[in-house]
Amino acid sequence: MAAPDLSTNLQEEATCAICLDYFTDPVMTDCGHNFCRECIRRCWGQPEGPYACPECRELSPQRNLRPNRPLAKMAEMARRLHPPSPVPQGVCPAHREPLAAFCGDELRLLCAACERSGEHWAHRVRPLQDAAEDLKAKLEKSLEHLRKQMQDALLFQAQADETCVLWQKMVESQRQNVLGEFERLRRLLAEEEQQLLQRLEEEELEVLPRLREGAAHLGQQSAHLAELIAELEGRCQLPALGLLQDIKDALRRVQDVKLQPPEVVPMELRTVCRVPGLVETLRRFRGDVTLDPDTANPELILSEDRRSVQRGDLRQALPDSPERFDPGPCVLGQERFTSGRHYWEVEVGDRTSWALGVCRENVNRKEKGELSAGNGFWILVFLGSYYNSSERALAPLRDPPRRVGIFLDYEAGHLSFYSATDGSLLFIFPEIPFSGTLRPLFSPLSSSPTPMTICRPKGGSGDTLAPQ
């Protein structure tokens, strides 16, 4: 019988006198008794002492609780040897007594032992039936409120479902609008492309034969002149008799020579490359560009708002810094481009010369060299009625632009120039592998009362650009 007694003693020693269950985090009081930490904390609910031991009633002025780790191991061992039996419904799990009361402060069911423990002395403790009736009334009010909330939630859910369906319909409608509009635009652009190509071909068929006819006529005249020159050169080598024989006929043919110049054919193309709506699209990428006075040639005069520049007749006394262009009559924009798409417009008015474009930030600004792509410049130069660049020879313009749009796509290596007035393409550089930092470049080239003015973006997206 020794083994059962030992097992029973182990259970008794490992059981808390308050909750009558195995110890959980046991602590020891000053009087030497052990309790679960949570049990003694609840039992000593008052904030100030003295504190009475629940077992021997000895008073202690302070909460001196020492962890009892050996007892915790013993309780764990007892728990493994004799697991606590399941607590029947309606029975207190701590004291294994019937639940007969309800604490309104902690909202807990209590047994008689719970009430005697002193933990709930200052709480609102009521019999089960009375507490149940009061809580039932509260629950019914809560149910009424929750049912109203449920009705509102169902209404909101129905509205949300309708909104989702409506939104999907709106998105689908707009999707069809986008597809339809772009398909229409593609057809219009394709038709416009065919019309431009057809007009260009007609213009080629109209002018090219006249140019070839003039070239052929000049070839015939050149051949006739070559024969006559050869004949006269041979006659000059003859003795006197041979030289003078039939000289009258030879001199007559010389006098009859009249060089007929070719027909003057205008070299301006009547067909211009103008894509409907292109400039409006490019303006989505417009930026607010201003001039950098530290880079301006001493002969250039900048406006106070740094948007206009013109060339003066006298040099200004300005610091000769490495950033300043000299002798080239150039000035850079403040903006620096290392990626992305950018568009800006410049009002040139009736100026007879100007240069616009971009350059690398590290270009040589002190040498009077060619502003070519090889030197880090990509610019369009306008001279009277012609424009050129380092990539293309002089080309005539039928209608010189009064406002020029510049579009840069850094990653695509694209730089193009447009007449911002009618949207016609002025020039496009071949694909450029840009690297490093690029900056806008402006040059008036010559003196003129008309300044070059950077247009200021107006309003929000989709608005036009206006000069200052």
Curated annotation (Swiss-Prot):
Keywords: Antiviral defense, Coiled coil, Cytoplasm, Isopeptide bond, Metal-binding, Nucleus, Phosphoprotein, Transferase, Ubl conjugation, Ubl conjugation pathway, Zinc, Zinc-finger. Zn(2+) binds at C92, H95, C114, H120. A zinc finger (B box-type) spans 87-128. E3 ubiquitin-protein ligase that promotes the degradation of insoluble ubiquitinated proteins, including insoluble PAX6, poly-Gln repeat expanded HTT and poly-Ala repeat expanded ARX. Mediates PAX6 ubiquitination leading to proteasomal degradation, thereby modulating cortical neurogenesis. May also inhibit PAX6 transcriptional activity, possibly in part by preventing the binding of PAX6 to its consensus sequences. May contribute to the regulation of the intracellular level of HN (humanin) or HN-containing proteins through the proteasomal degradation pathway. Residues 129-208 form a coiled coil. GO terms for molecular function: protein domain specific binding; protein-macromolecule adaptor activity; ubiquitin protein ligase activity; ubiquitin-protein transferase activity; zinc ion binding. Its EC number is 2.3.2.27. GO terms for biological process: host-mediated suppression of symbiont invasion; innate immune response; negative regulation of AIM2 inflammasome complex assembly; negative regulation of DNA-templated transcription; negative regulation of neurogenesis; negative regulation of viral transcription; positive regulation of viral entry into host cell; protein autoubiquitination. The modification Phosphoserine is found at S85. It comes from the Eukaryota. It catalyses: S-ubiquitinyl-[E2 ubiquitin-conjugating enzyme]-L-cysteine + [acceptor protein]-L-lysine = [E2 ubiquitin-conjugating enzyme]-L-cysteine + N(6)-ubiquitinyl-[acceptor protein]-L-lysine. This is E3 ubiquitin-protein ligase TRIM11. Belongs to the TRIM/RBCC family. It comes from Homo sapiens. The coiled-coil domain and the B30.2 domain are both necessary for interaction with HN and PAX6. They are also involved in MED15-binding. The B30.2 domain may be involved cellular protein quality control by promoting the degradation of insoluble ubiquitinated proteins. There is a cross-link at K458 (Glycyl lysine isopeptide (Lys-Gly) (interchain with G-Cter in ubiquitin)). Binds cytoplasmic tail of integrin alpha-1. Interacts with the HN peptide. Interacts with PHOX2B. Interacts (when autoubiquitinated) with SQSTM1/p62; promoting AIM2 recruitment to autophagosomes. Interacts with AIM2; promoting its autophagy-dependent degradation. GO terms for cellular component: cytoplasm; cytosol; nucleoplasm. Autoubiquitinated upon DNA stimulation; autoubiquitination at Lys-458 promotes interaction with SQSTM1/p62 and recruitment of AIM2 to autophagosomes.
